[in-house]
Amino acid sequence: MSVSVFNRCWSKVILETLVRQGVSHVCIAPGSRSTPLTLEAVRLQNAGSVTCHTHFDERGLGFFALGIAKATQSPVAIIVTSGTATANLYPAIIEARQTGVNLFVLTADRPPELWECGANQAILQQNMFGQYPVANVNLPKPNADYSAQWLISLLEQAAFQQKQQGGVVHINVPFTEPLYDATDEEVNSHSWLQPLQRWLIQNKSWINVEVQQNEVLMHENWDHWRTKRGVVVVGQLPAEQAMGINSWASAMGWVLLTDIQSGVVPTTPYEDIWLANQTVREKLLQADIVIQFGARFISKRINQFLQAFKGEFWLVEQSGKALDPYHHSLTRFNAKAHHWLRAHPPLRQKPWLLEPLALSKFCATFIEQQVGGNLTEASLALRLPTLLPYNGVLFLGNSLLVRLVDALTQLPESYPVYTNRGASGIDGLLATAAGIGIGSNKPVVAVIGDTSTLYDLNSFALFKNVTQPTLIFVINNNGGAIFDMLPVDEQVKDQFYRLPHNGDFSQIAAMFDLKYAHPYTWADLNSVVKQAYSRRKATLIEIKTNPSDGSSLYKRLIDQISHAVIGA
C-alpha cells in the first residue's frame, strides 16, 4: 500500500467530515508535512465545497480564521505544518476559547518514531494547547487497521462537543513520508474508502444528532420582579439579539446601561462617563434587580457598578459559560436575549430614576464642548458614526480608543461591532479585521492603535484579498497611550509602558501596496473616507495625535462629571 496515497485518503476523510460540520473556509499556512491535508483542501475548493485562504504567518492566520468564523458564525478550519508553526496559533486559540468561536485546528505532525529523538521540526504537539480546546483529537499516523468509519465518528464526537460548548477542536495529525506522488484517481479508488461511497456523495453527517430546543419559560416570580426597580445591563451580543432590548427596558421604566459591543441604542448615552458621578451611582445601587444580557464589558464604570451591586441578579446568556467575574448569587438563563424577552413581557411604568437621563443630557453638551472640532482621538470616537457605511461592520481594537468609543459613540441599533475582548490582547487585531471583511463580504471600518498595528504588521498582507471597501484607521499616538491612565512616574511610564516609536505608517502601506492617507483635519478626513468607499480595496488612514491628548480628555471628563450636581 502506498504511504502517500493513504495519507491522502486519511486527509480526505478528515476534511470531508469537517465540511459536513459546517466548514466552508479553510485557512492554510505553507509547509511540507501538512501537504496531504492541503491537497485535500485544494480538491474541495476545486469542487466548490470550500474557499481556501493562505498566509505565511501562522499567528496572523489563526486570527484571520477567527475573524472569518466571527463574521460567518460558522466553524473555520486551519491547516499548519509541524513544529513551532503550531505554537504560533496559541494566541488565537485562547481568544477563540474565551469567546466561544468555533475553529478546527489541524496540526500536521511528525510520526511518533520521530518524537523526542532529535529529529528535525519535531516537537511535542499532542494536547499542546492544554485546556483551551473543547476537544483534543490525537490521531495515530494513518493506518488501515483503523476503519474510516471510526475516524469519522471520532471527529464528529469532537464536533458535537464544539457545538455544545463553542470553541476550538485541536486535531493533531502525524504523517509518515512520502507525502507527495498520490493522484486523485488513486485516492478515490482506494479500498479503505469503499464503505464511504454513499456518504461521500451526500452532504450529511455520519451521525445525525437531534438537538432538542428548550423553550424559554417565564420565571415563576416574574410578576413580582417586574414591579420592582430594575437596571438592564447589556454587554457583547450578536446583532440579531439586540433588537427590542431598548424598547423593553423603556416600557419597564428601568435604567438601561449598554456596551458599544451590544448593538443596543442607549436611552441614557455616555454611561461610562456619567456613572462616574457618585450621587447617581449610589442611587442606581438602590435598584432591586439587575438583569444582564451578554457580558465582557469595556466600561470600567459599568464593571464597578456590577461589582458593587448586591441585590437580585439575573444573567441571560446563551453560551453556558461562567460570565460573572463578581460572583453574584444569581439566576442564570441559558437563552438568547430576544427569546427571553418574549417570555417576560414588560409591565409599563414610569421611570423609577430620572437622574441618569438628566446627567446624560448634560454630558452630551459638556462632551461636545470639551472635544472640540479638531481631528483627535476623542473627536474621532464621538463622530465615528458619521464615517460608517450603512451596510458595513465595525472592528475595534484593544487600545485607548476602544474605551473612548465605548464612552462617547452612539451607533445605530444592531450595527455590527466586532472585537477581540476574550483575552483583550493586542495581537492579531489586523488579521481579525481582515477575516471579518472576508467573512462578512461587507465594507469594514477597523480602528486600531499604533502599538497593536506594529505588533501585527505581517497581517497587512491579508488585505490584498479584500473585495469590499476596507478602511483601516491607525491611531498613532506614539506608543501605548492607554498606559497614561496608570499612576506611574512619567519617565518610567515612557521607558517601560508607552514605548514611543517616533514613526509613521506611510512606508508600511507602500510595502504592502495599500492606499495610504494622513488627514490633518475633519475636512481632509471626510474627503479621504469618501474616496476610500469608492474603491473595493483597503485604505490605511493614519490619524496622528499628541500622545496624552486622548487620555487627558478622558480623565478630565470623568473628573468633571464625578463632581457635577444635576437635578432630575
From Swiss-Prot:
Homodimer. HAMAP family: MenD. The keyword Transferase applies. Pfam families: TPP_enzyme_C (PF02775), TPP_enzyme_M_2 (PF16582), TPP_enzyme_N (PF02776). This is 2-succinyl-5-enolpyruvyl-6-hydroxy-3-cyclohexene-1-carboxylate synthase. Keywords: Magnesium, Manganese, Menaquinone biosynthesis, Metal-binding, Thiamine pyrophosphate, Transferase. GO terms for biological process: menaquinone biosynthetic process. Catalyzes the thiamine diphosphate-dependent decarboxylation of 2-oxoglutarate and the subsequent addition of the resulting succinic semialdehyde-thiamine pyrophosphate anion to isochorismate to yield 2-succinyl-5-enolpyruvyl-6-hydroxy-3-cyclohexene-1-carboxylate (SEPHCHC). It comes from Haemophilus influenzae (strain 86-028NP). It is an enzyme of class 2 (transferase). Belongs to the TPP enzyme family. MenD subfamily. The gene is menD. One of its GO terms (molecular function) is thiamine pyrophosphate binding. Pathway: Quinol/quinone metabolism; 1,4-dihydroxy-2-naphthoate biosynthesis; 1,4-dihydroxy-2-naphthoate from chorismate: step 2/7; Quinol/quinone metabolism; menaquinone biosynthesis. The keyword Transferase applies. Its cofactor is Mg(2+); Mn(2+); thiamine diphosphate. Binds 1 thiamine pyrophosphate per subunit. CDD domains: TPP_PYR_MenD (cd07037), TPP_SHCHC_synthase (cd02009). Coiled coil: none annotated. The lineage of its organism: Bacteria, Pseudomonadati, Pseudomonadota, Gammaproteobacteria, Pasteurellales. InterPro entries: MenaQ_synth_MenD (IPR004433), MenD_middle (IPR032264), THDP-binding (IPR029061), Thiamin_PyroP_enz_TPP-bd_dom (IPR012001), TPP_enzyme_TPP-bd (IPR011766). Its EC number is 2.2.1.9.
